Each structure stands twice: as C-alpha cells, then as structure tokens.
Amino acid sequence: MSYSQAVEAVTAPGARFELTTVEVAGRPTRAFRNAPSSLRELFDAARRHGDSTFMVYEGERWTFADTMAEVDALAAVLVEDYGIRRGDRVGIAMRNLPEWVVSFAAITSIGAVSVSFNAWWVTDEVDFAIGDATPSLMIVDPERAERAADPCERRGIPLIVARGGSDPLPAGARHWTELVERGTPMPEVDVHGEDDATILYTSGTTGTPKGAVSTHRAICQALLGFSCRGAIEVAREKADGEPAGAAGSTGPDGPAGESGPRVFILIVPLFHVTGCIPVMLGSFAAGLKLVMMYRWDARRALELIEAEKVTQFVGVPTQAWDLLECPDFDSFDTSSLRNVGGGGAPAPPKLVRRVQDGFAHGGPNIGYGMTETNAYGPQNSGRDYLTHPTSTGRGTPIMSVEIRDPDGNPVPVGALGEIWMAGPHLIRGYWNRPDETAETIVDGWLHTGDLGRLDEDGFLYITDRAKDMVLRGGENVYCAEVEAAIYEHPAVYEAAVYGLPHERLGEEVAATVRVREGEHLDADGLREYLGNHLASFKIPSRLHMTTSELPRNASGKMLKRELRDSDLMEDQDLTPSQR
C-alpha cells in the first residue's frame, strides 16, 4: 500500500482520523474531527483506565485512578483556596515529579494556563519569567521554592510546595500535603478549544526566553496527529501482510505488536515540549505506563528499561549514545525496546548504525518538531526510515510543509530553503511578543528558521539551523554535515561546529571536540582524517580538543554560544602570530 493510499484509508469518513475544516485565527484549516475539544476532555477520558498503572517514579506506582483523584483535589484547591479562574496563569517549577503531571492536568482542566518554568533556571531567570507571565500562583518543589521565593514575595504571589517535607517554607508558601485531599470533586468549568492552555518557554540558547502560547485545540490536534502517523504506517504493514509494528511504526497508542503494552520512559524534562506533549500527554491519552526519571542517568535508565519493560525511548541523540556507551550496557536486558529516537535533525549516521546494532529490536526513528509546533512535525520510522535514512520523514494529513526562499516564495522540489509549516497544531503566538509573533507566524504559516529541502515524494531533509550555518568566504558550510564527519572518527565522543569571525573570510569554521577517554587525538590528526571526507573549506581551521563534557541545556541541546564565546575570549588573549 502506498503512503497516499494509507492516508486516505485512515482519514476516511467515519474513521478515527476523519478530517474536517475548522477556523483557526480566522482561516479555514484542515483538522481531525475526532480530536478532544480540550485537555479537560482528554483527562476525563483517562479515568476509564482506572487501576492501570500510569506513573512509575522511584518506587512509587500511581494508577490512573490515583492520578485523577489527586488532579481533582488540586483543581478544587486552585479554584476554592486561591481563586484561580479560566485564563489565569499558574506556574510550575519543578523537576520531573508526579506532582508536575498532576499540576498540569489540574491547571488546564479548570481553564487556567500552565506556565512551565525551566528547572535549571537560577533566581534571575525565574524572576524574569515570573515578571513576563505574571502567574497568580506558583507550584514548586523545594529547590525551586528557594529560587522563586524572593521574586514571588516581591509580587505577592503565593506558592504551593510539593515534597517539601518538614523544611521551613518561604513566606506565602504552603505544603502540597496540607492542601490536597483526595475525594474532592473536580470543579465544573467550561473549557473551550480556543482557550489558551500552556505557555512553554523556548530553551533560550540565545537571547531572552520567549513564552510560546498554545491553545487546547492545538495540543489535542498534535496529540491525535502523533497517533495518526503511527496508524498510517500500521495500515501499510497490514496491507502488505506484515504484523503490526514489524517495521517499527510509532504512535503513542499504536498497536502493541508482539512486544506487549507500550511503555514510555520519560528521559527529557516535562518543562520542554517533547517531555510534556508526545511523551507525558501521549501516555495519558492512550492509557500507557510512564516511567519517570528525576534526572538523566544512563545506568539508571538501563535499570528501568529492564525492570519496567520499556518499549519507547524518546529523547535527544546524545541520550541514546550515552546508553550505548554505558560500561554496564551489556549486563542489562534492553530487548523490550521497540523504538529509540527523538526530535530534530537526523542523528549522525554513526549513531544510527549503533542504535541498529546495539538494540535487538529497537529500530531508530526521528521526528521533526519544536515548541512552536507542539513537537508535532514530519516523522520517519519503519520502512520509510530504511528507504530514506537521511530524511526526517513526511507530513501527515493536517500538516502542510513548504520550502521557501528568503522572500517567502516557494522553491522548486529539491531546492534548499527555509522550512515553513502550517496546521491547527501551531502555537497561537509568543506571550507579550506581538512583533516576534508577527515575524514568525505569517498568514497561518510558521517559518521555522531551519534549512531543508523536500523531495518529489514529500520527504523532508533537514540541512541545518539557518543561524547554524557558517558563511566562509562566500561558501555555505552546514554545521550538521561537518559534525557528522567528525563523529565518524573512532576517537571522538562528541563535537560541536560553529562559526567565528574572520577578518578576511567573514567567518571561519571552528569546532570543539571531546575525545573519548583513553584515546589520543590532536587537531592535526583530526584535520588529516577529515581531509578524506570533506572539502577543504569545510574542515575547521580552529579546533579545540578536550576531554571534558561539552555544555548542554536542560533539553540536551549543545550550547554552541558558550563554546563560541569561549573561543573568542581565548582569541583576544593571543598575539597575531599565535592565531
């Protein structure tokens, strides 16, 4: 069965993924007819899973019934004790804890807006976000309570502290256990699809973080979209006589196949879009078990994969690499894994091969999404991954993808340009940033800032971030290509490529390379190696070799700005003859 035939089958009238037309920001938009109208409806539907295990956290096991009883009780506290009303904003600042999930569900079920605070932020950053989002209440863990105490006290914002034990509380704070008492019913509130549901702050690798605002409808459409693309692959497998899931098809509520029920492990922060929407909400919606990690640790992840029979591993490429590099990897049973993947541009080919070889059944997959798309975008797995391994996949029925030139005009098939996306899953805009919203979303189209191309079959190929391209003497050097070549060297553990100012060329190519423990590799040796794989103008003229871990933010993205700034500072200390 062809891809288009499978799409037609799963979206036919009367099918679960039947299509309709809705109005989004005044524009007719193709959407799923049967998506939940709001997150409140989604959470209500999860009650049917009752005593099935939902969250597993450090020895705790929460059923769906446990979770919803806690959600109901907290929602009542928000309305009755704190006067939270539809449209009010409530901040969540904590690590990956069950209370994070409960807080999110309670806030959005009463029509309030969940504002996710990066758990890595220091007090100044927390202060900025509180001033930007102006929440009526903050729900925090003890560590975040310390950072939020002063900004909240100055503004008169109360706090609820989860898992605070008997530690003294900041002014205006109360313990979760003092307030939340199961048995209280969920307050009656009308929540609509057009209502704001979330503010997720972008990772802020450059400049000030922006709060991306999503509606209930956008999130629910994205969630059904994840399931739809799994259903499309399954339809193709069944039509060709293959068992469901044989080719590694994905989707939060796709068929279990031979592996039994699907089980997700949460290895990315809930305050970022991947952890919150496809992993947490996808598990919630589909009645799946969610194994939560407080913080990333490869050995602990292997323990949980074995003990809980985890099937879905969704993170950033470095986390799959960390698993495979763990000295105790071979002592754990990872045979339950069916999908090992993540988001963004395709992983280095060497990592893809390692995943294929290292996991008995865990086929690699990749998805392309971002905060502004609620993590939903083209996805590549199963047979498509085998035939198009360098592609990030193709869109699904509610998603439009175009490649455009700098003036916003579509380019021919195969030509390179900026990736633009449209659909009901996009954010409404940026909180308090009308100018940036207008620049980013134009006539219902999001221009992503990423460079790529589409082939004749609709497969998307990510070339690089537009701002992650080095313009060297008129030649475009794409950092992802150079990084992929560096990763092929057996002594390299990780690498980051970026541009530095150059008096003659405009920019020169630079890289920081972490050498694997016990290996020896110097800059000259790496350049000699790269000479066999890259054109000379692509080989970094500035190489910094290190054995230290390269800096990343909480979502696992490389902090290239820090590396670039460090190189620039070193450059200032050199004499012209030393450069």
Residue ranges and their predicted role:
Residues 1-15, 109-178, 517-519:
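Structural core segment of the AMP-binding/adenylate-forming
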Residues 20, 59, 146-193, 208, ...:
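ANL superfamily adenylate-forming
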Residues 34-35, 51-85, 89-97, 101-105, ...:
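Conserved AMP-binding/adenylate-forming core of the ANL superfamily
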Residues 63-65, 197-225:
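Conserved AMP-binding A3 loop
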Residues 121-128, 138-142, 313, 423, ...:
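AMP-binding/adenylate-forming catalytic core of the ANL superfamily
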Residues 222-263, 271-311, 326:
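Conserved AMP-binding/adenylation subdomain of ANL enzymes
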Residues 285, 307-315, 324-387, 400, ...:
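Gly/Ser/Thr-rich phosphate-binding loop
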Residues 535-555, 576-579:
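AMP-binding/adenylate-forming catalytic domain of the ANL superfamily
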